[in-house]
Amino acid sequence: MKKNFGKKAASVMAVAALSLSLVACGNGGSTEAASEAADASAGTASTAVTTSNNSGSENSQKPLVWFNRQPSNSSTGELDMGALTYNDKTYYVGFDANQGADLQGEMVLDYIKANADTIDRNGDGVIGYVLAIGDIGHNDSIARTRGVRKALGTGVEKDGGVDSTPAETNTDGSASVVQDATLEVDGKTYKIRELASHEMKNSAGATWDAATAGNTIGTWTASFGDQIDVVVSNNDGMGMAMFNAWSKENKVPTFGYDANSDAVAAIADGYSGTISQHADVQAYLTLRVLRNALDGVDIDTGIGTADAAGNVLKEGEDYRYDAETRSYYALNLAVTADNYQDFTDATKPYAPVANQLDASTSPSKKVWLDIYNAGDNFLSATYQPLLENYDDLMNLDVEYIGGDGQTESNITNRLGNPSQYDAFAINMVKTDNAASYTSILNQ
């Protein structure tokens, strides 16, 4: 709540400082390679991964929401239905990753078409792009890599989908995981080539690493900088690192994902575009499903059906719901030079659902909520501030826990007494590890 903002901020800063020291001595990354994975919006419903059995304990019956990382097998994409249906008050909140990935790919393609006469910097007839991959085992990263390759025609089929494997260096076009494509604009034919792509993982094992992306663009440009016409990134953290390190000065179009505040502001300085995950809707849904479960009202209250305060979202425009997997997905929006001024404050609550709930019908309740990596730009600088605004509006006393981005135990060790909380919101380090949390609730 607002009176606790200072305390919350201090707590987060302390956790962030701790996480930095832990990253330096961490033992390994938090992901595994994925040969084929479904996206976070529509993973393959399957009972192949059902490690989160409910014991019937008091804590196991409390409201639970998984958010941002959908319980699933990181190698196959199969959803962990045991975790998603842990009890009758369990839900998942994320965003439609396939829709957003396709939107990013189309945004890049549209830009190339509109600027084909000037985008080929060295005039060799090849429009070359580089791609920063966040995490080869993360469904969202996989979807975004596929979305770009599908839109640009550089994707190669593998196991019924577009191969998302990093091409590494491919300046000669010989890589097997991608292919050269052709694009005709105004009677002229161009070749499109993925010059290089790489998973941005640091030496401590943390993925989606902005510093690694900044260093990598330096390596790429030193070797083949004159061939790079477009820079694409799985997220804005890495995209902005490459933009600031090289492409801003060289006026090379750069595209990211997340609509982080710094990235949106950078559009005025040449950052070409990003995708809004509708984080304001995601954060609202994360707490709203808990609030509804705690109040014992219909889960659609304040979501698809207006509540007494007038809060309501538009299904099909703001979000979609998949009943089988009990999953809510926010819908994405493209942010470009044409509309970026509408997205300059990424931490502002979404106006249609920014009305205060009545404390007499929605009394104060205590919620335990973790952010898997206190150093993650999107989650810590955008998502958590939104949550902190919404928790006031929903009369929820939320304890925010920041992880190190590497180990589940760094988070679960701080859930020592679940009985003191009324509900739980969980953001895992690895999508495979739902049982690390439910085993505690089962006690």
Where are these regions (language model features)?
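Bacterial Sec-type N-terminal signal peptides, specifically the leucine/valine-rich hydrophobic h-region
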Residues: 19-22
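Short acidic (Asp/Glu) patches
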Residues: 16
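A residue-level marker of the well-folded mature domains of exported/periplasmic proteins
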Residues: 2-5, 25-443
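Bacterial Sec-dependent N-terminal signal peptides
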Residues: 1-13
